[in-house]
Amino acid sequence: MKKITVDLNGKDLRIGIVLSRFNSNIGEGLLKACVDQLHKLGVADDDITLATVPGALEAPAILLQMADSEQFDGLIALGAVIRGETYHFEVVSNESARGISDVQLSTGIPIANAILTTENDEQAEARVAVKGAEAADVVVEMINLLKQL
């Protein structure tokens, strides 16, 4: 049996990041943790491109454009959707996740989805550092995995 090994070497990988500006304090924390981890994995700052969007629902459209541009090896979606008093939380959470998955499946470009969906600010704040860094790990691993197939 041939086993494909995990490869977290980010050297020479080109990464696009789409950051939702809604709940910006959470998004900025995710971005910092993500970029710090990308650097630790060997991704050069010049190989990281950031685009911001108003909210999570707008992320898939920009991710699709980035994927279609053939300028990126992988993409990362960052942001936070925090439950409010209306059904809007479910719509935004579900549709942004579906849109991101659709882009990934239709283009073959790996996308790490770190748009947090939480019940409250405290839950989001508790996840910022870990989820931001995990997104970096996920995208680098998936890029390298796809290269081995």
From Swiss-Prot:
Pathway involvement of the protein, from the record: Cofactor biosynthesis; riboflavin biosynthesis; riboflavin from 2-hydroxy-3-oxobutyl phosphate and 5-amino-6-(D-ribitylamino)uracil: step 1/2
The UniProt entry, under InterPro entries, shows:
LS, LS/RS, LS/RS_sf
Q: Which UniProt keywords apply?
A: Riboflavin biosynthesis, Transferase
Reaction(s) catalysed by this chain's protein = (2S)-2-hydroxy-3-oxobutyl phosphate + 5-amino-6-(D-ribitylamino)uracil = 6,7-dimethyl-8-(1-D-ribityl)lumazine + phosphate + 2 H2O + H(+)
Q: Any idea which residues are catalytic in this one?
A: H88 (proton donor)
One Gene Ontology cellular component annotation held by this UniProt entry: riboflavin synthase complex
Q: Give the EC number(s) under which this enzyme is classified.
A: 2.5.1.78
**An MF annotation (GO) of this entry:** 6,7-dimethyl-8-ribityllumazine synthase activity
- What sort of enzyme, by top EC class, is this? transferase
Binding residue positions for 5-amino-6-(D-ribitylamino)uracil: F22, A56, L57, E58, A80, V81, I82, N113
Please give the function described in this protein's UniProt entry: Catalyzes the formation of 6,7-dimethyl-8-ribityllumazine by condensation of 5-amino-6-(D-ribitylamino)uracil with 3,4-dihydroxy-2-butanone 4-phosphate. This is the penultimate step in the biosynthesis of riboflavin.
**Protein name according to UniProt:** 6,7-dimethyl-8-ribityllumazine synthase
This protein's species is: Methylobacillus flagellatus (strain ATCC 51484 / DSM 6875 / VKM B-1610 / KT)
**Source organism lineage?**
Bacteria, Pseudomonadati, Pseudomonadota, Betaproteobacteria, Nitrosomonadales
